[in-house]
């Protein structure tokens, strides 16, 4: 068997998921909607609203709608595959069964890229809201900003130390075996939503409809600004959508709850579409309130736009409360993605594509300490020296690749195994799966050329590792060797 045709059997992947290993079915659609909203609402709305508005103007509202629609298609595909293969590994595992080992490696490497960069991006977003706290503690601006930031004296920042600190702090907690409880998570979700409601209510009295004209000053399609070089950031509604896509991460938390859902055929659809619709509505309302209260070209220059707008409106104390809500709640997003990163490494190492030492679990804490700390270090380095925009765009490239693979996996398995029982079926899959793939491809095209190049370079490194190690050492390769 050629390495191109190595595939995992679905029955092998799901073997053992029964009896004592089956989760209790306790969730209904309200739980799933709450789970999705809690996982999705995070750095995107607190920080990327401003950056997106700088690219699209008031049209950023449309950018949120487009990004949400593409993610909804991908989410429905995730739901079908997660019930078909209720095992760790997410898109990597689905691709291994549907399209084979090389594609699975590509997807797994994309997920590693995505999760590490998401941790870094959220750390930078957290830093922007914690800036004043660190400044009050005596930290100089030089240590509160990365090299890309121009300081008041004309110089540049040295390192974003708060981002480095939060990255390593969360990694340390995970390495010790700390788990966030459901109760704490629900409280923090409530804190995030209440802060956004307060923001919208305070913006309504000063809402100015003239701020929405022109609605799309940079046009709809992603394009380079006039006179800009090929590596410059693209502008337009689609350019903002390709960045704002970051704001919808986390919906897969709903699809992974399939095994615990009482009526998955009905409730998963409601949970996924409901949470995506709720978050898209929340994002569009917050974006509209922001633009109504302050012109896009003004607040887009701030790394903490919601706080900036409230300060501009002379709501200093409320601005501090919104910033505090972000400081308290955003680390849970970092924790969730660092936890997920360790699971991707674990499954790939278990499959032999990476050294098995990487999946070693500490006997005392029950966590893969080495990989957790390595993820923390990588996140700290990236967040300490790069801008939120650059990190988020590169993270989006990895996620888009994974979403494309998930859509393709649904199509391949529907055609190859049409009669296999499915607990949840993607509605209108011949339309939804291709729509998700095409939407992701267009969003990838809308990313800056520099981001696309970095994504290619990262995968060239990954391809070398696969050829030198994974292709020969994988469990399937060893099985082939033993059988020959």
Locate the predicted segments by residue.
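Membrane-helix boundary/coupling elements in multi-pass transport proteins
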Residues: 46, 87, 110-128, 243-261, ...
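Transmembrane helix-loop boundary segments of multi-pass membrane transporters
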Residues: 50-61, 111, 122-129, 138, ...
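C-terminal membrane-solvent junction of multi-pass transporters and transport-like membrane proteins
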Residues: 155-159, 357-369, 403-452, 472-483
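Helix-loop-helix junctions that connect adjacent transmembrane segments
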Residues: 18-23, 60-61, 65, 138-161, ...
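Membrane-interface loop-to-helix entry segments
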Residues: 127, 158-212, 216, 272-276, ...
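Loop-to-transmembrane helix boundary motifs in multi-pass membrane proteins
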Residues: 24, 29, 156-164, 262-283, ...
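Extracellular loop-to-transmembrane helix junctions
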Residues: 23-24, 47-152, 275-278, 285, ...
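Membrane-interface "cap" regions at the ends of multi-pass membrane proteins
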Residues: 1-48, 55-58, 72-79, 85-88, ...
